[in-house]
Amino acid sequence: PKFCTINNGYYETETFNHDAGMYEVMHVDHIVIGDQAIYVIKTVKFPEHVELYGSSDAKNWYYAENTDKQETHKHKVDNADKRNQSYCEYIQMLAGEAIRRDVPAIAIVNIIGLTDEQIHLDIESGHEVVTMDKLADRIRYYESTIDSDRVAYEHSDDLIRKFKEEEVYDNIIPQIRDVELKYRIYLKLSE
C-alpha cells in the first residue's frame, strides 16, 4: 500500500469562543491517506507507570498514578476518542467535497507511553484506541479489509490540496501577531 501523510493540521470549528473573539480551532495530529481509506490519528502521551480509565462516551478519561505512599492520584484528561471522532467526521466531509464521492475515514487514537495492560477503556465497536507498537498493524488491517477501489490514494493530490486549503494555521499566526502588537501598543500608551 501507498501512503501520504499530513501532520499537525489546524482547522476552524463552528464553535465561537466569545472570550477570544474567534472560532475555536481543532488540531489534527496526523492525516494518513492510504490506498483504501483516510486515517485520522490523534496521538496522546501519558506518563509511564499509570493506569488509564474511561469509555468512548464519557466526557473525560482519567489516569491514576500510585505514589510511594501507596496513595492513588487521579488526573482528568479529555476523552481523546470522542474528540478524534469529531475530527474524523470533519476530515471525511472535506474529503467528500474534494473528490465528490464518499471516502472511508477511520479515527484512531494512538497512545504513547502505556502498554495494553495499563489501558482500561470501554471503547465502542468501530472505535480504535491502540498503543504505538500496534498502530501500523491496525492501518494495515484496514487497508486489507476495506474495498473501496483505491479511492483514497488515487485522489491524494486533490485530498491534500483540500486539506491544506481549509487549514487555518497560516491565517491564525498573523492574527495572533496583530493582537500581540496591539496589546504592546496599548501597554506603551497606558504608561
Give the label of every model feature segment.
Residues P1-M26, I33, A37-I38, V44-S55, ...:
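Surface-exposed interaction regions that form or flank ligand-binding interfaces
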